[in-house]
Design a protein with these regions (language model features):
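A short, structure-level motif marking secondary-structure boundaries and short turns
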Residues: 2, 81-82, 167-169, 205-207
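Short His-Asn-centered micro-motif
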Residues: 114, 169, 235-236
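Short, solvent-exposed loop/turn segments at secondary-structure junctions
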Residues: 35, 116-118, 124-125, 172, ...
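Local sequence-structure signature of Cys/Sec-based thiol-disulfide redox active-site neighborhoods
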Residues: 1, 159-182, 199-200
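C-terminal cap of thioredoxin/glutaredoxin-like
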Residues: 61-156, 164, 179-186
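Short, surface-exposed alpha-helical recognition segments that flank or form part
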Residues: 4-7, 84, 88, 171, ...
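Structural alpha/beta surface segment adjacent to cysteine/selenocysteine redox centers
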Residues: 1-66, 179-248
Length: 248
């Protein structure tokens, strides 16, 4: 459901390498997409551990080896961890896809808890806060958020004509609606020229948008807007002529 899937994957890897250090994590810079052979080695290792306490430990180790293309590390891991056969792996993947569809979501690589979805480390603070409020934290409600959102702080230094901020707003994107004023304010606070490069909504470019994706985007935007104190509520879908008139 992406107009440029290869470009999206490349940007995702670059973003991971840039964002990870701010959360105390790591991701290899310049990582390539893992080839099918390496993925085919990792899946059997994890399949039999889905309900095993070792899943997290083995998953992290396998993930690091996968993204680093470290065949030797996978060889050593395979000596310690039993592998599932191809049929068992296929059944596990199909079962996972059915469960995801039943819970009305459109993508893998997600966390799900009690009807709420979390798509990456930058959303985990929502899950942490929810668990703390429920009393599910061993440290009680005073527990610090492990993956809290870093503050949006432009600093005190003013732009010396070397920097510019380019924004690609989509008039149908709730994320654009939520973040536009903050983006303008950020640019103004340090005297950075803001250049707007509008983009046509994906569905108006022929990219399919399943209902589950739309539901997630709207609920995620509402969750994010509440967190930053941005106004977000009832709306009309501007697809079609309203978007064209807005751009004009």
């Amino acid at each position: 459901f992406a107009p440029e899937p290869e470009m999206l994957a490349e940007n995702a890897r670059r973003d991971c390498a840039m964002v990870a250090p701010h959360y105390g994590l790591s991701f290899p810079k310049g990582a390539n997409r893992p080839n099918a052979e390496l993925v085919g080695r990792v899946e059997p290792l994890l399949t039999l551990l889905r309900s095993d306490s070792r899943f997290i430990e083995v998953g992290l180790e396998a993930g690091r080896a996968l993204w680093a293309g470290d065949v030797e590390a996978l060889d050593k891991l395979s000596e310690r961890v039993p592998s599932a056969d191809a049929a068992t792996v296929r059944e596990a993947l199909e079962a996972g896809s059915r469960t995801r569809a039943k819970r009305r979501h459109y993508s893998g690589a997600m966390f799900s808890y009690a009807g709420e979805w979390f798509w990456g480390v930058d959303r985990l603070h929502h899950l942490e806060r929810r668990l703390i409020e429920l009393g599910a934290s061993s440290a009680g409600k005073k527990k610090a958020i492990r993956f809290d959102r870093p503050p949006l702080d432009a600093g005190e230094n003013q732009n010396d004509a070397r920097l510019r901020l380019e924004m690609f707003p989509s008039l149908r994107s709730p994320y654009t609606a939520m973040i536009f004023d903050r983006t303008v304010g950020l640019a103004e606070s340090v005297n950075i020229p803001l250049e707007l490069s509008p983009v046509m909504p994906m569905v108006m470019r022929g990219v399919p948008a399943p209902g589950a994706k739309g539901i997630y985007i709207m609920t995620d935007t509402l969750r994010e807007a509440k967190h930053i104190g941005a106004p977000f509520g009832n709306m009309h879908d501007p697809i079609g002529r309203p978007v064209l008139r807005g751009f004009s």
